Swiss-Prot record:
This is Acetylornithine deacetylase. It comes from Pectobacterium atrosepticum (strain SCRI 1043 / ATCC BAA-672) (Erwinia carotovora subsp. atroseptica). One of its GO terms (molecular function) is zinc ion binding. Its cofactor is Zn(2+); Co(2+); glutathione. It catalyses: N(2)-acetyl-L-ornithine + H2O = L-ornithine + acetate. Homodimer. One of its GO terms (biological process) is L-arginine biosynthetic process. The lineage of its organism: Bacteria, Pseudomonadati, Pseudomonadota, Gammaproteobacteria, Enterobacterales. Binds 2 Zn(2+) or Co(2+) ions per subunit. It is an enzyme of class 3 (hydrolase). Belongs to the peptidase M20A family. ArgE subfamily.
């Protein structure tokens, strides 16, 4: 591909130098518009058709979809543009200055995962777009680190249906084909406070929560008995009761109690199914104490994800890398992209470096990642 792009390391440097933090704290949260425009300019310069879309319900956040080649199917290479915030006191380098030392590239987003776009652009130097028989898409999303709003919106609104997708999260170039989902909720009981000398004049929220927890533990057993997937180390959905707070003094009837819990569902269990099971489990408490129990989301939920084990994407990637696909415990945008086409999570850098001070990617990943991207484009866009 004829290119007027900067060298690989300069692409990387520019990506890292462009802050794109997403955070639930509005004081730390930033727009990714500058970074999206940077990517859109580069892909546009080398002949891609580029669309930049605002993500509804966000504060100045954008997705970018770049396409080259015509027809149906093809390959989608995807990644998120945002990073987590950084702890200034724990970094020994400037997070926004790409620093090379001891065969490592340091900077916020080097591994997770802005650098992936530099790898894609670099691999495209060897691709002749006139030889593509199917389209190549590149997706850059917003807010993966917080709400996954970018990937959700894209999966719900796009018309494209590639043959397959690869999300370039840092997996140390080990292909990942499944992970559990995550749903976290606050269960809040509103009681009636009063002096402990006369329990009849109050409603003790801790006692009601005790009832609620007993029903939740029954649900935990139900999840274990009803759902099973042997590819996971723990082959059933898990439930954790992680935080509880209620009351303020030994001599007062507790007026309010709140429990924070999570469920990690298997692939195939919908978020609506989980919501229904949770509401059904707590219904006896709600019915006995009308208006006193509420369930709310702590974080936007993420479904489980599994790429079909017999799909060509898996066999091609396993053969190229000489390694088998893996199952992981963390969550990605894969369940949303998977609604469009079979999806693998596969990229350079280690997940151990993600969200860490002095985040880095080992330069040993550069050559094999470039080769892998070229090979998958050849496999899925030339045939």
């Amino acid at each position: 591909m004829k290119m007027n792009l900067p060298p690989f390391i300069e692409l990387y440097r520019a990506l890292i130098a462009t802050p794109s933090i997403s955070a639930t704290d509005s004081a730390l949260d930033q727009s990714n518009h500058t970074l999206i425009n940077l990517l859109a300019g580069w892909f546009g310069d080398i002949g891609f058709h580029v669309e930049v879309q605002p993500v509804p319900g966000t504060l100045n956040k954008f997705n970018m979809l770049a396409r080259i080649g015509e027809g149906k199917g093809g390959l989608l290479l995807a990644g998120h543009t945002d990073t987590v915030p950084f702890d200034d006191g724990r970094w020994t380098r400037d997070p926004f200055t790409l620093t090379e030392h001891d065969n490592k590239l340091y900077g916020l987003g080097t591994a997770d995962m802005k650098g992936f776009f530099a790898f894609i652009l670099d691999a495209l130097r060897d691709i002749d777009p006139t030889k593509l028989t199917k389209p190549l898409y590149v997706l850059a999303t917003a807010d993966e680190e917080t709400t996954m709003a970018g990937a959700k919106y894209f999966s719900e609104s796009t018309q494209i249906r590639p043959d397959c997708a690869i999300i370039g999260e840092p997996t140390s170039l080990q292909p990942v084909r499944a992970h559990k989902g995550h749903m976290s909720n606050a269960i809040r009981i509103q009681g009636q406070s009063g002096h402990s000398s006369d329990p009849s004049r109050g409603v003790n929220a801790i006692e009601l929560m005790h009832e609620a927890i007993s029903h939740l533990l029954v649900l935990r057993n139900t999840l274990q008995e009803r759902y099973h997937n042997p590819i996971f180390h723990i082959p059933y959905p898990t439930m954790n009761l992680g935080h509880i707070h209620g009351g303020d003094a030994a001599n007062r009837i507790c007026g309010c109690c709140e429990l924070h819990m999570d469920i990690r569902p298997l692939p195939g269990i919908t978020l609506n199914d989980l919501d229904g099971l949770l509401s059904e489990a707590l219904a006896p408490v709600s019915q006995r104490w009308p208006g006193r129990l509420t369930i709310s989301e702590l974080h936007p939920p993420i479904p489980g994800y599994e790429c079909p084990p017999d799909h060509r994407l898996i066999s091609v990637v396993e053969n190229l890398l000489g390694t088998k696909t893996e199952i992981v415990n963390y969550c990605t945008e894969a369940p949303f992209i998977q609604t469009l086409c079979p999806t693998l999570v596969l990229g350079p850098g280690s997940i151990e470096q993600a969200h860490q001070p002095d985040e880095y990617i080992d330069t040993a990943f550069i050559k094999p990642t470039r080769e892998l991207i070229s090979q998958v484009i050849h496999h899925f866009c030339h045939h």
